[in-house]
């Protein structure tokens, strides 16, 4: 937040200092100025320019940045080379076993993340997934879920995920509403140091 405040002061001549209330008030009353500043601060990229910030402020139905085409995966992975050169990992993760044993967190490098995302994206394309299609995932919070999210987003497809600890009926209710073209699922999870397979859930989802 402080970095953003400093940027506003330097680039926009807006000095909020430590006055969060004033910053908040500006953000909800000067919508165009605030959201354009967010676009610029995070250096969002689009192959086509937006023609306005907020073309229609109806709720629901607001139209933000018409004309722009922003891809989430592209925004994330465009930092890969610089982050890798700086020695920063893309993902840092623990699982229940590594925490219990006091082991160091697992790390995935940016080149490896980019490689896995590209490989899965190609596979999804082979399955007929394209822009606007839905990809559903039945996955825990593991690196594979991040890879699948980015691969899905890179194709312009819609991502939806449910954790394996959700009841099968609840998962089916959610996935039936979106009619996914592809389902990505794990074959088990570890909870309280016990392995639970998802055979029964997999049968229901099929």
Q: Which sequence ranges carry the predicted segments?
A:
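Short hydrophobic alpha-helical segments of the AMP-binding
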Residues: 148-153, 202
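N-terminal amphipathic, basic-rich helices that act as targeting or association modules
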Residues: 1-49
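ATP-dependent adenylate-forming carboxylate-activation enzymes
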Residues: 139-140, 160-176, 188-195
């Amino acid at each position: 937040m402080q970095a953003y405040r400093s940027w506003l002061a330097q680039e926009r001549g807006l000095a909020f200092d430590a006055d969060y209330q004033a910053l908040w008030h500006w953000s909800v009353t000067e919508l165009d100025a605030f959201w354009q500043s967010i676009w610029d601060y995070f250096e969002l990229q689009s192959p086509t320019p937006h023609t306005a910030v907020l073309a229609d402020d109806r709720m629901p139905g607001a139209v933000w940045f018409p004309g722009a085409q922003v891809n989430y995966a592209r925004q994330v992975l465009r930092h890969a080379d610089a982050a890798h050169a700086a020695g920063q990992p893309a993902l840092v993760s623990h699982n229940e076993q590594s925490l219990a044993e006091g082991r160091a967190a697992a790390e995935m490098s940016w080149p490896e993340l980019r490689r896995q995302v590209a490989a899965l994206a190609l596979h999804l394309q082979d399955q007929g997934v394209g822009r606007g299609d839905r990809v559903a995932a039945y996955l825990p919070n593991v690196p594979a879920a991040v890879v699948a999210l980015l691969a899905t987003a890179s194709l312009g497809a819609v991502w939806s995920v449910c954790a394996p600890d959700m009841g099968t009926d609840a998962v089916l209710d959610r996935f039936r509403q979106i009619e996914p073209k592809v389902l990505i699922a794990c074959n088990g999870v570890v909870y309280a140091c016990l392995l639970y397979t998802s055979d029964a859930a997999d049968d229901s989802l099929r």
